[in-house]
C-alpha cells in the first residue's frame, strides 16, 4: 500500500497533500478551520443537491416547494435545516480562518491570500443568490434592496439592475437565474479551493511563531489528521445542536410569509453574516458612497500585505498591534449588531463611528503601530 500511494499518479497527489505533507510541528487549533471549511463545503454541496431535486424555481411554486420539502419529503426538514444552518457554520469558520490569517501574518503568502479573497467573495455571492430562493418576504425584499444598489453605478446602473433582474422587478426570471447561479457557484468554489491548496503547498503553511519551520516538520498524517477529525466532530456536534434544537435562531421569521411585492417588511436586512457590511453601507448617506464602502470593506483584505511594514511575521510578539486587532474584532461584532437594528438614533451614529473605526484601524493605526514596534525593538 505504501508503494502504491507513493507511485500511483492519482494516489500520489493525495499522498503529497494529506499524508506525507511536511507540516510545522507547532501549528495550533486555529489552523483547523481550513479543513472545517472543506467539510462545510461538502455538507453544503450534498444537502444542496438533495434540496435541488425537490425545489422548483418558479415564483408561484417556490415557497410551496420549500414547505413540501419540510413536510412531505423523507427527512426533508433535516436536509433543509442542515443546509441553512450549515451556511452559518461555513461563515463562522470562514471569519475565524481569515482572522487567523490576519493575526498570524498568513497574508504574506501572497498567492494563497489573494485566492482566499476571491474564495471569500465567491462564497458571499453564493450565499447572496441563495437568499431569494425560499421566496419568503425577507428573502424577496432583501434581494430587491441589495440588487437595487447597483443602480448607484453612474450611467449604466439602472440598465444593469434590470439586466440582472431580467425585468423591471425581482420576478420569475430573477429567481430562475439566481437558482442556476446558486447551483453552479459551489463547484467553482471547489475548483478555487484546489488552487488555494496548490499555492499553499508550494510555500508550506505558516505557524504561530512566524519563524521559518523548515528545520522542524512532521508528517500531516497521523498527527494533523487526528487533530482535524476532532475539529470535525466538534463542528458536527455544534451544527446538529443548532439544527435539532434551534433551527430558526439564525433565520428571519418574515421568511415564513410568502413573498408579497405590495407589502414591505418593517426592517429589511440580509442574513446575519452580511450584517457588518450592510451596517457600513447604511452608515454612508450617499448611495454610491455606501456601495463603494461596502465593496471596500471586503477588498480591504487585499491591502494587508501592502500595508504591512513590520519586521516580524504575525502579532504574537507585538502587543500594540495585538490590542488593535482585538479592537478591530470587537468593532466587527458591533457592526454586525448595528446591521440588524432599525435605521434610527442612536444606531445610525454608532454605525457611522464603527464604520470609520473599521477603516481607520486597518489603513492608519495598524501600519503606524508596526512602525512604532519596529522602533521600540530597534528593527530598522
Swiss-Prot record:
One of its GO terms (molecular function) is metal ion binding. Heme b b562 binds at residues 83, 182. Its main location: mitochondrion. GO terms for biological process: mitochondrial electron transport, ubiquinol to cytochrome c. Pfam families: Cytochrom_B_C (PF00032), Cytochrome_B (PF00033). Gene3D superfamilies: Cytochrome Bc1 Complex, Chain C. Its cofactor is heme b. Belongs to the cytochrome b family. Heme 1 (or BL or b562) is low-potential and absorbs at about 562 nm, and heme 2 (or BH or b566) is high-potential and absorbs at about 566 nm. PANTHER family: CYTOCHROME B (PTHR19271:SF16). This is Cytochrome b.
Amino acid at each position: 500500500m505504501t508503494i502504491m500511494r507513493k507511485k500511483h499518479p492519482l494516489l500520489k497527489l493525495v499522498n503529497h497533500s494529506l499524508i506525507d505533507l511536511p507540516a510545522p510541528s507547532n501549528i495550533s487549533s486555529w489552523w483547523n478551520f481550513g479543513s472545517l471549511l472543506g467539510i462545510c463545503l461538502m455538507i453544503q454541496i450534498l444537502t444542496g443537491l438533495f434540496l435541488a431535486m425537490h425545489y422548483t424555481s418558479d415564483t408561484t411554486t417556490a415557497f410551496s416547494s420549500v414547505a413540501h420539502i419540510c413536510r412531505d419529503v423523507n427527512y426533508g426538514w433535516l436536509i433543509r435545516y442542515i443546509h441553512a444552518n450549515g451556511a452559518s457554520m461555513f461563515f463562522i469558520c470562514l471569519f475565524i480562518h481569515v482572522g487567523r490569517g490576519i493575526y498570524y501574518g498568513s497574508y504574506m503568502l501572497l498567492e494563497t491570500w489573494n485566492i482566499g479573497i476571491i474564495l471569500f467573495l465567491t462564497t458571499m455571492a453564493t450565499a447572496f443568490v441563495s437568499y431569494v430562493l425560499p421566496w419568503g418576504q425577507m428573502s424577496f425584499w432583501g434581494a430587491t434592496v441589495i440588487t437595487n444598489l447597483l443602480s448607484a453605478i453612474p450611467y449604466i446602473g439602472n440598465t444593469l439592475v434590470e439586466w440582472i433582474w431580467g425585468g423591471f422587478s425581482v420576478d420569475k426570471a430573477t429567481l430562475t437565474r439566481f437558482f442556476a447561479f446558486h447551483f453552479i457557484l459551489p463547484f467553482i468554489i471547489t475548483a478555487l479551493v484546489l488552487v488555494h491548496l496548490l499555492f499553499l503547498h508550494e510555500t508550506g503553511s505558516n505557524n504561530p511563531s512566524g519563524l521559518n519551520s523548515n528545520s522542524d516538520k512532521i508528517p500531516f498524517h497521523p498527527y494533523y489528521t487526528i487533530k482535524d477529525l476532532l475539529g470535525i466532530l466538534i463542528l458536527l456536534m455544534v451544527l446538529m445542536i443548532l439544527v435539532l434544537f434551534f433551527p430558526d435562531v439564525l433565520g428571519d421569521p418574515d421568511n415564513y410569509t410568502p413573498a408579497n411585492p405590495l407589502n414591505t417588511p418593517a426592517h429589511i436586512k440580509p442574513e446575519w453574516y452580511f450584517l457588518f457590511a450592510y451596517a457600513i453601507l447604511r452608515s454612508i448617506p450617499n448611495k454610491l458612497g455606501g456601495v463603494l464602502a461596502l465593496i471596500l470593506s471586503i477588498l480591504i483584505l487585499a491591502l494587508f500585505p501592502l500595508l504591512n511594514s513590520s519586521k516580524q511575521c504575525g502579532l504574537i510578539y507585538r502587543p500594540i498591534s495585538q490590542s488593535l486587532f482585538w479592537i478591530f474584532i470587537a468593532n466587527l461584532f458591533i457592526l454586525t449588531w448595528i446591521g440588524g437594528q432599525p435605521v434610527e438614533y442612536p444606531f445610525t451614529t454608532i454605525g457611522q463611528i464603527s464604520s470609520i473605526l473599521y477603516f481607520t484601524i486597518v489603513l492608519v493605526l495598524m501600519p503606524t503601530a508596526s512602525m512604532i514596534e519596529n522602533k521600540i525593538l530597534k528593527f530598522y
